[in-house]
Amino acid sequence: MKIARHLAPSSIALTLTFALTTGWHAPGRAAEGDVKLVRATLSRSLSAPFLWGFNSIGEKYGLRVQVLDAITNADQQRNIQTGGVEIGSVGYQSPAGMAEQNVQNVKIIAGMYVGGQNLIMRKGVELKTWKDIEGKKIGRPPGTYAGILFTLAAQVNDVDLSRVSLVNTTPAGPPELQALKNGDLDGFILWSPIIDRVVIEGYGYYPACCDIGATKEFGAGNQLLAANTDFLKDRKLAVTFLKAYVESMDFYGKNPDKTIALVAEYTGGGAAILNEAMKHSRWTYRVNVQNAINVAKEGPKFGFTKADMSGKVADYFDLSYLAEATGQSVEQLGSYGP
């Protein structure tokens, strides 16, 4: 059940009633008049094909999803917070930001996506241990969660970052790809499927030693499913949605050919690159609350909060709806498990 994060975003936000066809339809679809609309906000990324392709499964639960394109986690949080949508994706650093802003009407109700952002190195530049990064020229996009995870992972692994030539790079992709190819960078941090293009085109590799999401403290969490509390007031609807959400995630996880066809259609990504991306990330409806708390402690250092908001982060998770939908306990759902 694997997949990946951030592709080139669309230049404008637009509302899309998802109409991509996958050649598959769920049995027992509800009558048209019985279908309820749930609005979602997502980036055009690889993090949630099971929401872009939700309707073929959701309709047997009497639900359809309409997607509002958004570029950043902040955009998506704002759409949920203002009631423009019922649900959407946010990042693992988002609960800390919401706590500092005293946001009262958004709760995280499920997991979504793990991995999909990492360090990629140029072929010929050998990296066997984290310490080998010292002396290398590494591109890091400032203000991004991928950049934060790299810094935290490097520190956990005793890298002296003062001995690393860190270059501020863009989150766009093409300039970084060219810089790596030309030898202007030894490596850079970004998200899939941009970094997977490097592997497929043969001039870069994932260093086995140095997965930025492999630390116990901070993990590889990427995207979470959040909801407006007005939507959650209808508990039956919210639980039903989560049942369909889990089933859709499971379906696309077990049918990678359909996933790749779907993602290629709405992102324009090539099948080989998407296949590579799927090796380095995964979907899960479970979350890791402790990772989010640990990340929140680092907020002041990286500037995504002014103060340490870690003591309030757990209050932004309400996994009781997911527990009812799955039959698992809140405690089970609050960690990735073995």
Regions found by a protein language model. Give the residues of each.
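Bacterial N-terminal signal peptides
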Residues: S10-G23
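Secondary-structure end/capping motifs
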Residues: K233-D308
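Short, glycine-/small- and polar/acidic-enriched structural segments
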Residues: A30-A172, N182, D186-S192, A208-C209
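Short, solvent-exposed loop/beta-turn-alpha elements that line the ligand-binding surface or hinge
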Residues: K60, D211-F218, R282-V289, G311
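Bacterial N-terminal signal peptides that target proteins for export
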Residues: M1-I12
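Pocket-lining segment of extracytoplasmic ligand-binding domains
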Residues: Q93-S94, A172-V263
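Conserved C-terminal helix/tail region of periplasmic/extracytoplasmic solute-binding proteins
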Residues: F302-P338
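Sec/Tat signal peptide C-region and signal peptidase I cleavage site
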Residues: G23-A30
